Amino acid sequence: SEDNKMGMAVFGQVRQKDGFDSDGDGFTELTALKAQTLGMRSYLKTGVYSKLTAEYHHLHEFRRGGDNLNLPPHEAMIAEQVEHGINTGSLRFDWFSPDDSHRLAAFASAQHISRSSYYGAGMDPDAYGATANLTWMAGTQYIRKFDRCIFMPSDLTLGLEYNEDRLNDNMWGYGRVTSQLVRIGSFYAQNEWKNHRWSFLLGGRLDKHNLVKGVIFSPRANLRFNPVDNVNLRASY
């Protein structure tokens, strides 16, 4: 818009190439390819100190290699074929206070992958497979900037996240079926004291994985020292 309160960018691409057989033996060295890509990113300023951002990406890709590319894969002597459909979207809200001492973000994203494949030789009718995968996450983050906390300016960061991953993978002809659901809930906190010469960071993260007993704690510590402007010494744990 003319007042820059909202905007959108859209892109797309189509790509296609034939399979390449360099020595004329009837088998490709480079696969045939068909691909379409579409995406967008938009934003809306909901206030002087807040903004909403949305993104979406779509990819469809088909690849085929081997011989007799015009026939179904199981009618070729050697065939490698894979087709992907990938859709990804995200939504994010950002807010900060007039003096920038408080920042808050809330976000969510998801991705769905659909994959069908064939990897076989000798006209094998059992070499087909299919995969479906849905992953999504949501969370929030808060940052508080202090002009002085105990002995130095600092930034306090707190956050919550939740991730879920559902996977179904099938190769029916070989009797292989995989189904898995993973859920992870997380909380993290850290405080970083810093000035132009020193920085001290202490923090930790708690993760609860549905396939792991108990809560996983991951500590974090970082020390930075700049004896002169062009020298940076750092130790991390």
Language-model features: where?
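Membrane-embedded beta-strand positions of outer-membrane beta-barrel proteins
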Residues: V10-G12, M40-S42, A54-Y56, L91, ...
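Repeated loop/turn-to-beta-strand initiation elements of outer-membrane beta-barrel proteins
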Residues: K5-M8, D18, V48-L52, P98-L104, ...
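Transmembrane beta-strands of outer-membrane beta-barrel pores
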Residues: V14-D18, H58-F62, S97, A110-S114, ...
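Structural signature of Gram-negative outer-membrane beta-barrels, strongest in the C-terminal barrel
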Residues: F151-T157, E161, N170, G175-Y237
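Short sequence motifs at beta-strands and strand-loop junctions characteristic
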Residues: E2, L30-K34, A79-G85, A130-L134, ...
